[in-house]
């Protein structure tokens, strides 16, 4: 019998998003590809080495001058040849960030994103394309499941035993303020010919409670013996008390 994980969805009086927020008009469906592009940049570009993308928002905004407020109409100003985009990212890193490093990353991402959009066929004829980029670094990234996956990947790459790595990561997450953590790994672990399952769970994990704030992340981990399926749950507490 299957069980319901209730990872990310509607909560009582609380809506949670998964990775991205779209606030674009229906006339611009070409921006759907941008989430894959941003993940590729942060993973492969040397400027973003050691950074992990936690969440990002892509919104469209309209610039209106004071003299045009009387004649302003969203339907008339939202034309395909004048697109203004606002890109907001949440990034986790081990290195302490300062104003200069954030500014350099924002300028680099602005350049790459603008260059990428100009190459798209439907956007070649654009006369006015403006992009704003804002990057926010998380203060406590260890509570994010994406960061836990990154640390697990590092430990396995160094040759640390998988059970020891899971125990160390889960204990660190509990020490940083999480009320519960659960990590599940499936596949050919340690090169065994038979697929096995390892589950490391510490603290509470009320998956059936709608008022619980649980972050979830799943991804495939590539090893020499094949792919390992990794699922991570992090319980931060109850939203309604």
Curated annotation (Swiss-Prot):
The keyword RNA-binding applies. The lineage of its organism: Eukaryota, Viridiplantae, Chlorophyta, core chlorophytes, Trebouxiophyceae. The keyword Disulfide bond does not apply. It comes from Helicosporidium sp. subsp. Simulium jonesii (Green alga). One of its GO terms (cellular component) is plastid. Its main location: plastid. Belongs to the universal ribosomal protein uS3 family. The gene is rps3. Disulfide bonds: none annotated. Keywords: Plastid, Ribonucleoprotein, Ribosomal protein, RNA-binding, rRNA-binding. It comes from the Eukaryota. It is found in: Plastid. Pfam families: Ribosomal_S3_C. This is Small ribosomal subunit protein uS3c. Part of the 30S ribosomal subunit. GO terms for biological process: translation. GO terms for molecular function: rRNA binding; structural constituent of ribosome.
């Amino acid at each position: 019998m299957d069980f319901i994980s209730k990872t990310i969805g509607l909560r009582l009086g609380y809506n949670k998003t998964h990775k991205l927020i779209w606030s674009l008009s229906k006339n611009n469906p070409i921006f759907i590809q941008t989430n894959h592009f941003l993940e590729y940049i942060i993973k492969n570009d040397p400027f973003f080495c050691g950074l992990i993308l936690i969440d990002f928002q892509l919104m469209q905004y309209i610039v209106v001058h004071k003299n045009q407020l009387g004649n302003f109409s969203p339907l008339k100003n939202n034309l395909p040849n004048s697109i203004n985009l606002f890109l907001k990212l949440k990034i986790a890193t081990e290195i302490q960030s300062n104003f200069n490093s954030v500014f350099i990353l924002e300028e680099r991402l602005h350049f790459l994103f603008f260059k990428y959009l100009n190459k798209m066929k439907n956007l070649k004829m654009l006369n006015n394309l403006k992009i704003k980029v804002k990057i926010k670094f998380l203060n406590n990234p260890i509570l994010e499941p994406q960061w836990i996956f990154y640390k697990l990947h590092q430990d396995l790459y160094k040759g640390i035993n998988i059970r020891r790595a899971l125990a160390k990561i889960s204990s660190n997450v509990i020490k940083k303020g999480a009320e519960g953590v659960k990590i599940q790994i499936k596949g050919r672990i340690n090169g065994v010919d038979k697929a096995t399952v390892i589950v490391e769970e510490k603290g509470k994990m009320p998956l059936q409670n709608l008022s619980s704030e649980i972050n979830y992340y799943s991804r495939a981990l590539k090893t020499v013996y094949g792919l390992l399926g990794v699922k991570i749950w992090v319980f931060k507490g109850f939203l309604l008390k």
